[in-house]
Amino acid sequence: MTREELLKSKVIKALSIAVSAKSTNGYEKMFLEQVATEVSKYDVYSVNIAEAALFYVSRLEETPAIIVLKRDLEDLLG
C-alpha cells in the first residue's frame, strides 16, 4: 500500500469516526458524510481533506483508538 493509499484510508476512517461522534453537530455530520463519500467513491483526495479530518478527530474525546488515529494522520501528513 502506498503512502497516499494509507493516508486516504486513514482519512476515511477519521471522517467516519467524526460523523458518528456525539459532539459533532448535524451540519458537520452532513458535510463530513459528503466528504467521506467523495473521497471513497470518486477517489477525490487532497492534503486539505486530510488536515480537515485531523481537525475533526482532534476535537473528539481521546480514546486509545483516537490517539492512534491522530498520531497516524500526523505522521502521514508529515
How should each PLM-predicted stretch be described?
Residues K41-D72:
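Short, charged early-sequence alpha-helical segments and their helix-coil boundaries
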Residues V11, L15-A18, E33, V47-A50:
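Short, intrinsically disordered, low-complexity terminal segments
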Residues L32-Y42:
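Amphipathic alpha-helical segments that form the core helices of the histone-fold
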Residues T24-M30, D43-V47:
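Alpha-helix N-cap/helix-initiation sites
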Residues M1-E28, K70-L73, L77:
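Short terminal alpha-helical segments
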